[in-house]
């Protein structure tokens, strides 16, 4: 997910730096980023296998993610501090939940005044240990929104308004902006 986000941003013409780790089998990923125009200065090459995800998409547009952490879960606080030292107030930091040290990354980015965007996928219980009050933008699907808020309703395509789910997220995180993705039905903000 992180690589896809960086590729999309770079292809859109946004100056993009991708930070993280790749394993011995991941050099092709750095090449994909470079070809898209993303900067890869902050990618570390580590021994072992690359992290990866398998995304299973259902006909209704929903997905299920199977994750192997690999090198993605080997970030160090020293590495985080080094990368963030190159950024400043007002710079965007886009995070997804496939890596480790997210709470630390968010704390340091918040101290610098960076704008934090969080896609909590793949959702797990650790998300509730993160300083979510520091998130400026959430990128959520319906299931993640329900999990974050405890809001237990169906969505519009199943008979109940999606606006109520978006309102629940906004109520839980009043200082954050929210993009709620709705599978084949698009998204709302």
Q: Where are each of the predicted segments found?
A:
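Substrate-binding N-lobe of the ribokinase-like
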Residues: 1-52
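Conserved phosphate-binding/catalytic loop of the ribokinase/pfkB sugar-kinase fold
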Residues: 18, 43-45, 55-92
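Cofactor-binding loop segments of dinucleotide-utilizing enzymes, especially the Rossmann-like FAD-
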Residues: 21-24, 59, 68, 119-121
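Short gly/ser/thr-rich secondary-structure transition/capping motifs
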Residues: 37, 73-78, 117-123
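Short acidic active-site motifs
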Residues: 82-83, 101-104, 125-128, 165
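Glycosyltransferases and closely related glycan-assembly transferases
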Residues: 88, 103-116
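Conserved phosphate/ATP/ADP-binding segment of small-molecule kinases
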Residues: 111-115, 121-189
């Amino acid at each position: 997910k992180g690589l896809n986000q960086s590729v999309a941003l770079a292809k859109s013409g946004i100056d993009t730096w991708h930070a993280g780790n790749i394993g011995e089998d991941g050099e092709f990923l750095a090449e994909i980023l470079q070809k898209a125009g993303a900067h890869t200065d902050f990618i570390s090459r580590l021994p072992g296998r690359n992290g990866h995800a398998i995304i299973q998409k259902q006909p209704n547009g929903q997905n299920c993610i199977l994750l192997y952490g690999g090198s993605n879960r080997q970030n160090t606080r020293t590495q985080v501090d080094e990368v963030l030292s190159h950024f400043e107030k007002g710079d965007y930091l886009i995070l997804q939940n496939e890596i480790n040290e997210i709470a630390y990354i968010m704390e340091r980015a918040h101290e610098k005044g960076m704008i934090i965007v969080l896609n909590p996928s793949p959702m797990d219980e650790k998300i509730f240990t993160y300083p979510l009050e520091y998130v400026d933008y959430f990128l959520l699907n319906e299931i993640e929104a329900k999990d974050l808020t405890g809001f237990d309703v169906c969505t519009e395509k199943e008979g109940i308004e999606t606006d109520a789910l978006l309102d629940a997220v906004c109520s839980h995180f009043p200082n954050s902006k929210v993009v709620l993705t709705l599978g084949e039905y698009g998204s709302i903000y």
